[in-house]
């Protein structure tokens, strides 16, 4: 039996990325894997640098009995100090997803997307193209949503990001795509899905300009994001989110990138590579058919982890 401790902050993306690795290890390993999850919350202490958090945790867990843990995986900045403290208490192998921001060489492996690597890659770093995607999420459906859909029409989804540290969207950048989708709605069922970052005024303007029969999500507590990736024939996605683009490309569906001007250079470079590799396209007047090798970075990462862990 192989024991894994997964440590995350309260972000859903952190949990999903840890799960992507855990589920793939379970799939390809011959050993039985048991997983324990730990969500960490530090309140005001979370604003401290990781080196200070680590010092505090070493004292806090100084007398904790040694536990049987074979592998520790963590995601989220404040989870990295917990990872190292429990590694010392258990002699487990460990791995952190994304930049731990301290003591990098004390992690057996660090999983980092290429767009976040600024210098030469360290020996303990496993690089990925885009973000890790939990492929089991594609299997999750929503009966409430399925009842709303037109079974006779193929689907086109428009995934809309929003504002944050890395991007800012203005409605004019979406307007042309909305007009295109209005025209395509005679043949296809069009579904819009907003992110948590989408400003309210953008949502209102999209709903105002779109054909009234189009569907808009999330609705209350229902967000069929993964279902839409699974059932859509075509996916339009704004260029402000590497994670949304990575999720879309992991579906193998035909992806159109909707350009956004105010985005960080690393995001712009990522979308440019996607377009150059012809994995996705920018809409040029008609829907096209093309094939590409869908993203499967989790499998590549886990093949390397299997060697490190002797699984």
Residues covered by each model-derived region:
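A donor-sugar binding/catalytic signature common to diverse glycosyltransferases
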Residues: 11-14, 225-267
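Extreme N-terminal starter segment of soluble prokaryotic enzymes
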Residues: 1-5
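A nucleotide-sugar donor-handling region in carbohydrate enzymes
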Residues: 105-170, 283-295, 299
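Catalytic donor nucleotide-activated moiety binding site of glycosyltransferases and closely related
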Residues: 187-221
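Leloir-type glycosyltransferase catalytic cores
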Residues: 271-311
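Active-site and donor-binding regions of nucleotide-sugar-utilizing enzymes
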Residues: 6-130
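Conserved catalytic-core segment of nucleotide-activated headgroup transferases in glycan assembly
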Residues: 163-193
